[in-house]
């Protein structure tokens, strides 16, 4: 029995020793594995750090080269211009933005009442609709039946340059002095005087005076076209007295009271055509003279009509007063 117990004790010791050796071996193996993984991790970390350092170096080198070639401000300006050009040519974004803005504006203003939302008393829309119906313009027949007033075309605004004068068709009537002065200027300078007085007229009297002067100019031109008869100085249907010389070679010594001479009474019956041409008056002269006469009469008639209108308006204003 004691021998068996000794054998069992030895076997147990051997088992414990084997297990301890196995544990030591396992621990050693784990330690070796940990050391191997640590070394591998360190090698990997080192390689990553080297790669990052290389990348940083390459990027820093690239940035330094780009900064040397292109300045930073120029790159920013170029980026801004490119962005502006892109926004300018981006048509789709513009269309969508406009649509969204329109829809948002409609939605925002649809539920509000404008400036009257903060007021307790708001205007009634029914009254405005009734007033609009009452302010309907008249029909064509009603407007045609309404005659123009008697003072139509008359301007009584005293703030204008024509103070206290009645304006007809935008011009004051004027007086006789303006009429005579423009007649004198238009007649004296003929066409140039007519242009100056007609363009610069400020009244009906000045206008009609310039036209009257033009008519007198035409009458003068028509009269100047009529030919003059030389024999009219002696008298109509009379011929000049001619004397007959005894010696034709002594014509230089002829005196009035030197000798008695005989009158030459020879008359030719041939038609030389001189008197017939002088007696005929050209039709152009007649036309120009009649044109001038018509212009003068028309100017006087127009001025008289304007004066009658002025008198009529003055009488109406006095009756109303």
UniProtKB/Swiss-Prot annotation:
The keyword Membrane applies. Disruption phenotype: Increased accumulation of copper, cadmium and cobalt ions and enhanced sensitivity to the toxic effects of copper and cadmium. Exhibits no additional sensitivity to manganese. SMF1 fails to enter the vacuole and is stabilized. Reverses the aerobic defects of yeast strains lacking superoxide dismutase (SOD). Concomitant deletion of SMF1 completely abolishes the ability of BSD2 deletion to suppress SOD deficiency and reverses the increased sensitivity to cadmium and copper. However cobalt ion hyperaccumulation is not suppressed. PANTHER family: NEDD4 FAMILY INTERACTING PROTEIN (PTHR13396:SF5), NEDD4 FAMILY INTERACTING PROTEIN 1/2 (PTHR13396). Residues 41-57 have a biased composition (Acidic residues). Present with 3070 molecules/cell in log phase SD medium. Keywords: Endoplasmic reticulum, Isopeptide bond, Membrane, Stress response, Transmembrane, Transmembrane helix, Transport, Ubl conjugation, Vacuole. Belongs to the BSD2 family. This is Metal homeostatis protein BSD2. Changing residue 149 to S: Reverses the aerobic defects of yeast strains lacking superoxide dismutase (SOD). Associated with elevated copper ion accumulation and increased sensitivity to the toxic effects of copper and cadmium. Its main location: endoplasmic reticulum. InterPro entries: NEDD4/Bsd2. It is a multi-pass membrane protein. The lineage of its organism: Eukaryota, Fungi, Dikarya, Ascomycota, Saccharomycotina. Residues 1-71 are annotated as: Disordered. Required for homeostasis of heavy metal ions such as cadmium, cobalt and copper. Controls metal ion transport and prevents metal hyperaccumulation by negatively regulating the SMF1 and SMF2 metal transport systems. Under manganese-replete conditions facilitates trafficking of SMF1 and SMF2 metal transporters to the vacuole where they are degraded.
